[in-house]
Regions:
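Alpha/beta enzyme core
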Residues: 3-8, 14-44, 57-61, 65, ...
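A mid-to-C-terminal "edge-of-domain" accessory segment
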Residues: 5-6, 10-12, 251, 257-441, ...
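Non-catalytic terminal/interface segments that mediate subunit docking, oligomerization
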Residues: 18, 23, 31, 166, ...
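Hydrophobic alpha-helical scaffolding
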Residues: 22, 48-49, 78, 119, ...
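A glycine-rich helix N-cap at a beta->alpha junction
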Residues: 69-74
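Small-aliphatic-rich amphipathic alpha-helix that forms the alpha element of a beta-alpha
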Residues: 207-233
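Mixed-charge, glycine-accented linear interaction segment located at domain edges/termini
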Residues: 499-534
Length: 535
């Protein structure tokens, strides 16, 4: 059976840039565009030329894309102006792009209140603008803003807006759930009705927002109902609650039975294996920790903790996994916790590359130690590096790179020379490396920061291994109430190549807990990078 072609349209660089706290540079946009092109999307919307200096510069030279078309976004001409005499439209038409996507109203309420013009005038704005864009680029698209709200209020007018764009030469008329409030059953019904009116959905697209956590579901239902273009963003970036997440949509369209059998999104199985890396590239660029629980690509998406689950997964992964993790470039993780059985432990050791004898009595000691530590507050299911350090130490496979003799942290609150009240933290660390005693003193913006700097200030001959080590996240959880509470500290570290790992420490003293986690982080990196202790 021939499959229907569905085209992926990425708007990370335009709609995704509306995310609170996100501000792409021109170089950021170029990097993301290359990643999207490698992934295999059909269209990359680069931004709004003329709206800001960044987008104007980005569109001054078309990026060298091998697979995707480069799209300029903008709005239809303003009321009272011709298409040839509208500065905003002119900036879009001057852009170095392969196509243009113009947004316009399709809800009569918006036409009356926001534009203050007649419905006929709005239809004219759409048609004239699309004609101009089609003449300039050869491919024009119309984003029907508020289409679903407009259709529910006045289906005839919303349909007229879509038809006006298509009749004017638009390759695509994209149905936008701009406010994000439409439900999946409504999307399926409305798209189905529109497809029936037009006779085909081959020139229709869908653009959804995630205000009810239904953006992906709404997009899938629209495809089932007949649209052939799907818009979204990497990791669901977008204004308010975000847009449809292409990272979740792509594998669903490729791997889930109905979509796999009926549509072709122009991506290969090999392309799909780049999905996890693409998602994490964006997070790294934004300096954000990846969402561990993200569908398909999260670190926990294929993580198994319960002993019964692990035993079954090792026999056949289909028992607890809906798709193979490697199909999306992810990996399976077997977690260690107080629920862990021996099977979990052995699998986790194998994954970490730790050699063991199944008859080694120290394996039982390790399992009991893990359970005891978790009872005290440790959590190894999210701190794989700390688990590996503990396991290797118990099994006699952890080198002793250095010894900490003592550390001290002081916090002083005083007035500085300018009469300002400041709080200063200072840490001192005394350690032995190859029999030599080293002292390090460092200040920080807090006691943990100062201790981190002091630990990494001078490790003798190991210093080169940790020069690119940095602490990127620090989480504290109070495990029981009161001033004598036990504290758990979880630290996320990273290196210059973007690799990240997690370590954990527990103590009634928050500084001591942080010290344990910091020590595990440093020792794990030395181990991973092949540092060798003196004989």
């Amino acid at each position: 059976m021939a499959k229907d072609r569905v085209y992926l349209f990425d708007t990370t660089l335009r709609d995704g840039a509306q995310t609170q706290g996100v501000d792409f540079s021109v170089e950021d946009k170029r990097l993301i565009a290359r990643a999207l092109d490698k992934l295999g999307v059909a269209y990359i919307e680069g931004g709004w030329p003329g709206a800001n200096p960044t987008d104007s510069e980005f569109f001054s030279e078309k990026p060298a894309l091998k697979r995707a078309k480069f799209v300029a976004f903008g709005m239809t001409k303003r009321p009272g102006r011709s298409a040839a005499n509208d500065p905003g439209l002119a900036a879009i038409l001057d852009a170095k792009a392969d196509a243009a996507c113009l947004v316009g109203k399709s809800w009569d309420f918006q036409v009356d209140v926001a534009l203050g013009i007649t419905k006929a005038e709005n239809i004219e704005l759409i048609a004239d603008s699309i004609v101009a864009a089609h003449k300039r680029f050869g491919e024009a698209m119309f984003d029907a803003e508020h289409f679903f709200d407009g259709y529910k209020a006045n289906p005839d007018f919303a349909t007229q807006c879509v038809k006006a764009a298509l009749d004017a030469g638009a390759r695509w008329a994209v149905l936008c759930d701009t406010n994000g409030g439409t439900m999946p059953d409504e999307v399926e019904r409305i798209v189905g009705e529109l497809v029936a009116k037009l006779g085909s959905g081959d020139r229709l697209g869908i653009h959804t927002h995630n205000d009810t956590e239904n953006a992906v579901a709404n997009s899938l239902m629209a495809v089932k109902a007949g649209v052939r273009q799907v818009q979204g963003t990497l990791n669901g970036l977008g204004e308010r609650c975000g847009n449809a997440n292409l990272i979740a949509l792509i594998p669903s369209l490729m791997l889930k039975p109905w979509f796999r059998d009926h549509v072709d999104i122009g991506m290969s199985e090999q392309d799909l294996t780049h999905l996890t890396a693409t998602s994490r590239t964006l997070d790294e660029l934004l300096n954000r920790a990846p969402n561990r629980h993200a569908a398909y690509v999260g670190a926990s998406a294929f993580a198994h903790k319960g002993g019964l689950h692990v035993s079954a997964v090792m026999k056949d992964p289909r028992t607890y996994e809906h798709v193979p993790p490697e199909s999306v470039g992810n990996t399976r993780k077997i977690l260690i916790s107080d629920q862990a059985g021996r099977s979990n432990l052995l699998v986790r050791l194998t994954e970490a590359g730790i050699k063991y004898d199944p008859n080694d009595s120290r394996l039982n000691l390790l399992l009991e130690d893990v359970k005891q530590r978790e009872a005290e507050g440790y959590s190894y299911d999210g701190a794989e590096a700390s688990f590996e350090v503990l396991a290797r130490r118990t099994l006699g496979q952890m080198p002793e790179f250095f010894k900490i003799r003592s550390f001290r942290v002081m916090v002083e609150r005083r007035f500085n020379a300018r009469g300002e009240l400041v709080t200063i933290s200072e840490a001192t660390v005394k350690l032995n490396v190859d029999g030599e005693t080293l002292f390090s003193v460092a200040e920080g913006n807090g006691p943990v920061n100062a201790l981190d700097h002091a630990l990494r200030k001078d490790l003798g001959r190991y210093q080169a291994y940790i020069d690119d080590l940095r602490l990127v996240d620090f989480k504290v959880r109070i495990l029981n109430g009161g001033t004598e509470a036990t504290t758990r500290v979880m630290i996320e570290s990273a290196d210059g190549q973007g690799n990240r790992w997690f370590t954990v420490g527990v103590s009634p003293n928050i500084i001591d807990a942080a010290f344990v986690a910091l020590m595990d982080s440093i020792q794990w990196k030395l181990l991973r990078d092949g540092a060798q202790p003196s004989k």
